């Protein structure tokens, strides 16, 4: 940002920005956070000159970038893909329809689908089966585990069947990893989730936190720099089990599903973190029979 006209004081909160963003060539890695890329894709068309985004590494979480490009096109913005990134003409304006359908969130639906796959049958409505959302992969992954999934119109239902461990490449689906760890705990044998090192830079170090959570509920787990290996089977210890969510909404939701699906009573610290992405999560959980108490 400093090379393109913006000065940021980010040593402490609040973050202070000054200056005006200038068009030009923006070079950044593609394997740190897709949000850096999508933010630029939204902003650069509004600048005066032409800009280019050049990536120095392979893209991860490409689905989120595809969603951004689809939205930009809908609102009249031109972006051209290049060999190393994208070219963005300047001086553009956003023009869109008065009404816009917002498709359902596959990332949040994944928690319920895993719950259904572990112990019952749960359907989620309002999902686009052709969505560019990378987390749509949850349906195929549950099938690979051995669970049953059925699609009818805009609804998908996951139903319990005996599950077996699998290998999962997490490079394009990092947000699914916490709930996939729960699915792995309910599957027979080992599940390896690899290409997951980027999870260490999320709201928490999700690899380390999920390894800790799995251990606390009696699941055998091995944490590596870029992967996590889980052996199915849950043997919770006696006494109170307290989970520190590290204020990470996906950790809270994953462990809440683990509690009700695997039959483990937990105390989850920082459960209010769900307000970031799914404020009604615990209301929906109660509708499905989950018992929760706010401390």
Predicted regions located by residue number:
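Short, structured segments at the rim of ligand-binding sites
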Residues: 1-295
């Amino acid at each position: 940002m400093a090379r393109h006209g913006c000065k940021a004081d980010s040593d402490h909160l609040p973050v202070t920005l000054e200056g005006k963003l200038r068009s030009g060539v923006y070079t950044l890695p593609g394997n740190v956070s897709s949000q850096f890329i999508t933010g630029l894709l939204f902003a650069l068309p509004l600048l005066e000159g032409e800009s280019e985004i050049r990536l120095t590494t392979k893209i991860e979480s490409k689905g989120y970038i595809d969603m951004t490009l689809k939205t930009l096109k809908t609102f009249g913005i031109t972006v051209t893909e290049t060999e190393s990134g994208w070219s963005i003409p300047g001086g553009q304006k956003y023009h869109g329809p008065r009404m816009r359908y917002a498709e359902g969130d596959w990332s949040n639906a994944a928690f319920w689908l895993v719950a259904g796959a572990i112990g019952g049958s749960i359907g989620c409505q309002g999902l686009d089966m052709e969505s560019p959302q990378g987390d749509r992969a949850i349906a195929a992954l549950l099938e690979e585990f051995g669970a049953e999934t059925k699609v009818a119109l805009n609804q998908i239902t996951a139903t319990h069947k005996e599950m077996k461990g699998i290998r999962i490449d997490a490079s394009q689906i990092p947000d699914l990893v916490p709930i996939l760890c729960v699915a792995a705990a309910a599957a027979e044998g080992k599940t390896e989730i690899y290409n997951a090192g980027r999870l260490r830079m999320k709201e928490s170090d999700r690899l380390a936190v999920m390894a800790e959570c799995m251990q606390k509920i009696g699941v055998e787990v091995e944490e590596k720099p870029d992967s996590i290996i889980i052996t199915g089977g849950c043997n919770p210890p006696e006494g109170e089990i307290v989970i520190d969510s590290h204020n990470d909404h996906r950790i809270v939701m994953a462990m809440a599903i683990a509690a009700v699906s695997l039959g483990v009573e937990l105390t989850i610290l920082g459960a209010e973190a769900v307000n970031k992405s799914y404020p009604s999560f615990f209301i929906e959980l109660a509708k499905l029979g989950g018992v929760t108490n706010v401390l």
